[in-house]
């Protein structure tokens, strides 16, 4: 079992590992103009870091813990269909929605100045 961290971004918690890419709903702290490809990001909302057999838990977040990464590109999630119908009224409405996502890759996880790569 390698090094991983649990971060909070876009209203959800993600288990991230260095060298892998993930899709997040949004980065609330970033301006949409900054969300270009290869933009570097720092995520400070780190809930937990696991390195080999040691586990560091935050309450609610870890101090001096940073997940460094870069944005690959923005994309859309799967389309969901919303269908509203009023019975006996001939009222039907069908809508589609696709969530805007940002795909980012995690470069490193650091805690108290010590960087973890895999």
Swiss-Prot record:
Predominant location: plastid
Taxonomic superkingdom: Eukaryota
InterPro entries for this protein: bL21-like (IPR028909), bL21-like_sf (IPR036164), Ribosomal_bL21 (IPR001787)
Disulfide bond entries: none
GO biological process entries: translation
GO MF annotations, alphabetized: rRNA binding; structural constituent of ribosome
SUPFAM superfamilies reported for this sequence: L21p-like
Subunit structure: Part of the 50S ribosomal subunit.
Record's function text: This protein binds to 23S rRNA.
PANTHER family, sorted: 50S RIBOSOMAL PROTEIN L21, LARGE RIBOSOMAL SUBUNIT PROTEIN BL21M
The protein's name in its UniProt record: Large ribosomal subunit protein bL21c
Organism: Psilotum nudum (Whisk fern)
Gene this protein is translated from: rpl21
